[in-house]
Amino acid sequence: MLKKIFIIISLYLSLIFSVNANIDIKARTAILQDFLSGEILYEKDPDRSIYPASMTKIMTSIIAFDLIKSGDLSLDDKFIISEKAWRLSTAGYSSMFIMVGDEVSVEDLLLGIIIASGNDACIALAEGIAGTEEEFAILMTSKAKELGMENTNFANSSGINDPDNYSTVRDILIMSNYLIKEHPKYYEWFAEKEFTWNRTGGDPITQGNRNPLLYKNIGADGIKTGYLAVEKYSLASSINRKGRRLIAVGSGFETKSSRSRESSRLLTYGLTN
């Protein structure tokens, strides 16, 4: 019996070693997957609980994309901006800079979320779809459970700091896979490098995509950055080179530069494994 246990433990340890051979990513937690085969090529404490920060916005977008796909929502639908949504644009958070009373299309709100990482746009979209952000968060968590994201709960649509808004890099990976598989047309928006909001009563505002990998020559085409002081820097990313797609998620990078460097290292490593 002891011999069997020893063999099982040895096999498990050898599997972990083979997955993580030859590279150590400087993040608290990370995971890398081959999109087509589903094979995990690297993992580092992938089930550790994290605050997903703006990676939360992937699910916010998914809820809208699902509704568009089912015919219950249109890109041309317009939502009136509430004071709650507007206040986030003046509170120092990443914003689309929408104004109270503006009527903004679903398409513009989604682009403001995906490219400009607008927290104000998240609330506007959430309220437009579900009535309140709290009700929208329930939809997000329900979708997460449907996808098998077992260690995730969403408390808001933007990822601002809340102890009840938590996930893991493994769960973020599951969510990213769903986005790319089920909504390839809209996933292309995540590769856009800038978005111009032609706001009411003011000059147009152009903002760049915050994903640093889009500006490197590695074939990156998404997905979403994140930052919270309690979590440090995070990134869900994907590259598509020579017909092979890889998805990586990391959290707990100490700096912006290390997030960019280590995520790039991880994805490049995956191309040779």
Summary of predicted features, one role per range:
Residues V19-R170, N177-K181:
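Active-site-adjacent loops and short helices of periplasmic peptidoglycan-processing enzymes
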Residues M1-I5:
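Positively charged n-region of N-terminal signal peptides that target proteins for export
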Residues I8-I16:
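Bacterial N-terminal signal peptides
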